[in-house]
Amino acid sequence: MALNLQDKQAIVAEVSEVAKGALSAVVADSRGVTVDKMTELRKAGREAGVYMRVVRNTLMRRVVEGTPFECLKDTFVGPTLIAFSNEHPGAAARLFKAFAKDNANFEVKAAAFEGEVISASQIDRLATLPTYEEAIARLMSAMKEASAGKLVRTLAALRDQKEAA
């Protein structure tokens, strides 16, 4: 399907707007994946707050110019599916990692987070980032454990003091 100039400009404008507000981006090759499976992936992406789009590589290079995702330019070769995480930096990486596990033809090429390229072999770094709620829960449990430990040490010191006296 040939796109005229106005269509191309509209695509670049739409995806650029999403890229400006995105926390991370993941690039994948979806050759050989059935339409049904891709529909499932897109549905899961919408539920996870991930914007997915297949865009021509030349247009994607224009989209990422001047953004933290400019480092991904070299990965725009062949069929490219790009996903932008809008709510949580690891959402798209987690989604693609799980999908690639079930679909051998789906290949994650690379990801970008804060201007740094993350190779496909290291995608776990991004996928295992805790969500905001998980991070708060971990912090609260660490603070709770620290105060409980401090109480135990104080009681032990008091006990030792009384035994020594």
UniProtKB/Swiss-Prot annotation:
GO (cellular component) term, any one: large ribosomal subunit
Highest taxon of source: Bacteria
Gene Ontology biological-process annotations: translation
GO molecular function: large ribosomal subunit rRNA binding; structural constituent of ribosome
Similarity field: Belongs to the universal ribosomal protein uL10 family.
Description of how the protein assembles with itself and partners: Part of the ribosomal stalk of the 50S ribosomal subunit. The N-terminus interacts with L11 and the large rRNA to form the base of the stalk. The C-terminus forms an elongated spine to which L12 dimers bind in a sequential fashion forming a multimeric L10(L12)X complex.
UniProt name for this protein: Large ribosomal subunit protein uL10
Species whose genome carries this gene: Sodalis glossinidius (strain morsitans)
Gene of this entry: rplJ
